[in-house]
Each structure stands twice: as structure tokens, then as C-alpha cells.
Amino acid sequence: MEWVWLIVFAAGLALAGRAYLRSDGAGELPPKRPLLLVPVCSPGDRTSPALLEWAAGCLAEELGAKVTLAERPVYLQKDAFHPHTRQGDAVHIVNLVEPLVTPDRAVLGVTEYDLHSPMRRDLPFAMGARKGWAGLLSTYRMEDRANPDNTRVRLRKMLVRYGAELMCDAPRNEDPTSLLFNGLQSPEQLDEMGL
């Protein structure tokens, strides 16, 4: 009988550890800095203001952080896009966002363009990029045509992922059910992650 309780106790510890890993970046770490949310688009185009306001609300609600909207977008020129795939170069674009970072503020650029990463040629697209306290998030691949309500859930998860990294210094991990999973490569994987 003693062994049964010991096994149950050990299983409980294992599950508690897994839950801690799942919430480590969002609920467990307080924000260390505010975030500037900035639209990223081409001249003459614009990122939906309603999308940005919703994103700011999600980040404030989920992370308890101060989020402000940038007054002006980061504009992209033609050299930010691959000439054949017409995807934005995530590394190039996050470098354009980075100058907005200050010693006491992180920055997250939000774009509706499809992205690729020259650093990950094994992947046909990128959902975002990060460099220090600068991040970039693409909404392009978040759509779930089979379940349209899931589109916003996916986007919320990506916002919390980047927000937790940029504002809370949350580390990535190897738990595929965590928003901070290091191996995230597709929007479908977001469906398996808790919020």
C-alpha cells in the first residue's frame, strides 16, 4: 500500500512539473518591461488597426503588461521581400524593428505578410522572428479554414509566446504542449499548446 501512494505522489509531481513548464513563460513570470506594438507594412498599405488594438488587449490581459501602440508603422521596401516567393525576409524585417527598442522597452512588429527565414531554409515559411528585445509576428498563416474560430486562438497563443519572451524573458523549452516550445514550426502545432 505504501508503494501505491509513493507512485501516486511521484506521478503527481511529474504532472505538476509539466504544468509548471507549460505556464512558465506566461503566468509564472511577471513582465520586466513594457512593449511597443508596431504595425509592419509597405508604403500605401496598412496593418489593420482593429487587429493591433485586439493584439494589445490580448497581451495586456494574458501577461498583465503595459502595451502601447506605435503612432507610425515600420515601412517595408521591395528589398524586404524575396523576388520569387514574395515572402518577407523575417531576419531583414526584425532588423528594421530593432531600432525602436529602448533600454526599458521591448518591441513587437505585427505584419499580415507571409514570411520566410533565410536562417531556416528547411522551412517553407516563418511565423515570426526575434532578436533580443525585438520581435516580429506574421498573422498570414494563422488562419484555420476548418475551424475559423480557432484563427484568433492561434494568434493569441503566438502573441503570448512572443510577449512572454520579450517582456518576461521567458525561456523556450522542449515541451510540445508549451507556448514556449522550441520546435514550433507550424500553426497546427499551436492547436496542441495550452494557453
Q: What label would you give each PLM region?
A:
Residues 1-5:
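Feature marks short, highly hydrophobic, charge-poor N-terminal signal-anchor/signal peptide-like helices
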Residues 8-16:
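Hydrophobic membrane-insertion alpha-helices, especially the h-region
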Residues 9, 124-126, 195:
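Short intrinsically disordered coil segments
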Residues 21-31:
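Ser/Thr/Pro/Gly-rich low-complexity linker/stalk segments immediately outside membranes or between
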Residues 32-47:
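Fold-level signature of zinc-dependent metallopeptidase catalytic domains
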Residues 39-41, 140-143, 184:
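Short, histidine-centered active-site or binding-site loop motifs used for metal coordination
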Residues 49-162, 166-170:
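Metzincin-family zinc-dependent endopeptidase catalytic domain
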Residues 170-194:
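Post-HEXXH active-site segment of zinc metalloproteases
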